[in-house]
Amino acid sequence: MKIKNKYVVGVHIMFYEIEMVSEYIDSCIGMIQNIENKENLTFHFTWNISEYFESIDTTKISKEQLSNLFNLQVNRLSNLDVKTIIEIKTNDDDVYNIADYRRDLNYNYCTKYDFILWGETDSLWPKETIEIVEQVEEYSKNNNISKYVLFFSERKMWDPSWQPIEHNDFTDVTFIDNNDWALNNLSSSKSYMTLEQMYEVNSKAESLDVRILTNPKFDGSCLVIKSDLIKSGVNIPQSLLCSGEDTSLADMAKLLLGDSFVQYVIKNILRVHNRRHPNKRLYISNENNPRGFCGDAKGNWWNILEQMSKHNLGTIRQQSHTYTMKDVFNKIKKG
């Protein structure tokens, strides 16, 4: 198919995520296979090998080997005559994380592309992604909707507030809050699902079940953003240090648009967010936490960073101290 709109698909990849990259690239290849005018597509990557918080375990792998693995995967897209942009972050740069990346992606590319797509290393794009966005955009134009986000559905989540974005096949499942069920049952949003398994779920959809939400409910993995939303001033606040960048975007969108906010949810097309991917955090010195559990499993630095970031998020509309990365490092040093 020939597409009318221009797309940038961006992902921030930390060195410890390298063993998940091939699956992410597989999903990117899957969603562009039927696109004739691939010049309308750009894939943006930031490869982050900085070690401000996590150090590379060089007894297992070197920086050069990590970068070679990264380039090998990105070249799979480049070899399909798709434009790829790579930026690299090291300790020569300031601290840079997914919140910085997504803020910059939004700001730098909203005037160059019609849609900004947030990828995530542990997530998988539906192969129908571009085709669906094109269809929804046609509907939006006909109904004078120019600022919106689009989100594919999720498997069973851990609390009822997520039900509006759960896939039709999973919404009636009971979430069991223990690791035995949550990490192993394919209905659970915390379990590992392959690209082929996602494709199988999506193959059942004979027509699209599209819902419209006026209150935002999404996370940052496989989020589709109409650039007009960013142009109008919606973005991740600079005060957001790391954790909660997706929530902050949702909050700012609702704050600016109010009752005019629009989120499309494709209730019968699944995208996968493998939150507890078995290879989520590898090659980190003095850490054995491959599934990426938060809290003490990551280290006290994470608790400090998360706490300060969430404080900033929760006090955006209040008179309150705004923490900075300097505050984070000072508290880490104090122990």
Task: Pin down the residues of each PLM region.
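Hydrophobic targeting segments
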Residues: N5-I13, C28, L41-W47
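Short beta-strand-to-loop acidic/aromatic patch adjacent to the donor-nucleotide binding site
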Residues: K112-L124
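Active-site beta-to-alpha loop of glycosyltransferases that engages the nucleotide-sugar donor
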Residues: V11-D26, I49-F53, D93-Y96
